């Protein structure tokens, strides 16, 4: 352990026929794989810029640990003069996990960090291409005053994204990795007189709406002149969408021909 701080990137079921995400009903495996790899690299690129923090990449199943290794190698080749990327391999550990519900895996990751002696722990998705390094750094910084950092969900709930080691009860009071009632959670924390901070950090992709949301975020960043965000996402996303549209059109034409033939 080189630092008191740790950032855990959780790669939830990257892609595969045995663990289909809802979005795979629309897009085929190979294009979803390329898209999520790009999202992961962008996320890792930003997290690498957070100083004084170790990084752990939790991958399920363990056979996909190559995802983390490949991403580090690829980023190092793409940015050979980048100091933050140059030191990425030395401060990163890859954790292989069994395929289990995300909440169960999150608790396992939390236990690993606590047993390793980390004081400040950030749990976040590995697929957040719109994240900024400042947001992750803020999550760690806020832990100096607040024992718990909550992340909002688009459904109006919340979940635990960061906590201090002196507040292990947070794991049982706040849902980890899944939605829970915002009111119930904040009331429970209030009764225990635990100070918490909310930060928009852990966004994940699991539905078609998520991809559309990310496209809007990338377009907004480009409109406001932020060229750093989405270093490789935009190109891959564009190619991904083009290929998907071609596939959808071909499928539609095929159906029409079949209907005509019949």
Could you say what each language-model-derived stretch is?
Residues 1-23:
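N-terminal nucleotide-binding beta1-loop-alpha1 segment
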Residues 36-52:
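A short, N-terminal amphipathic alpha-helix
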Residues 52, 118, 144-148:
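Short, high-confidence coil segments that cap the C-terminus of an alpha-helix
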Residues 53-63:
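Short beta-strand/loop segment that forms part of the nucleotide-sugar
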Residues 67-119:
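Short phosphate-binding loop-to-helix
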Residues 118-127:
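Short beta-strand-to-loop acidic/aromatic patch adjacent to the donor-nucleotide binding site
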Residues 129-155:
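Conserved donor-nucleotide/metal-binding helix-loop-beta segment in metal-dependent transferases, i.e.
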Residues 180, 184-262:
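Conserved alpha/beta core of the MobA/IspD/sugar-nucleotide pyrophosphorylase nucleotidyltransferase superfamily
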């Amino acid at each position: 352990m080189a630092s008191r701080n740790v950032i855990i990137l959780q790669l939830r079921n990257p892609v595969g026929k045995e663990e289909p995400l809802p979005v795979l009903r629309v897009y085929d495996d190979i294009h979803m794989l390329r898209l999520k790899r790009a999202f992961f690299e962008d996320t890792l690129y930003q997290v690498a810029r957070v100083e004084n923090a170790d990084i752990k990449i939790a991958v399920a199943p363990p056979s996909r640990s190559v995802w983390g290794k490949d991403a580090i190698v690829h980023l190092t080749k793409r940015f050979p003069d980048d100091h933050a990327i140059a030191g990425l391999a030395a401060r990163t550990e890859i954790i292989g996990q069994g395929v289990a519900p995300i909440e169960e895996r999150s608790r396992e990751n939390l236990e690993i960090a606590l047993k390793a002696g980390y004081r400040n722990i950030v749990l976040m998705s590995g697929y957040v291409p719109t994240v900024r390094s400042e947001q992750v750094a803020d999550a760690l910084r806020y832990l100096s005053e607040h024992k718990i950092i909550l992340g909002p969900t688009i459904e109006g709930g919340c979940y635990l994204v960061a906590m201090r080691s002196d507040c292990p009860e947070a794991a049982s009071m706040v849902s980890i990795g899944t939605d829970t009632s915002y009111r119930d959670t904040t009331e429970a924390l209030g009764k225990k007189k635990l100070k918490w901070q909310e930060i928009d950090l852990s966004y994940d992709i699991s539905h078609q709406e998520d991809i559309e949301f990310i496209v809007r975020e990338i377009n907004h960043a480009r409109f406001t002149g932020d060229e750093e965000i989405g270093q490789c996402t935009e190109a891959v996303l564009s190619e991904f969408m083009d290929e998907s549209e071609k596939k959808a059109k071909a499928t539609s034409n095929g159906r029409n021909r079949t209907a005509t033939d019949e």
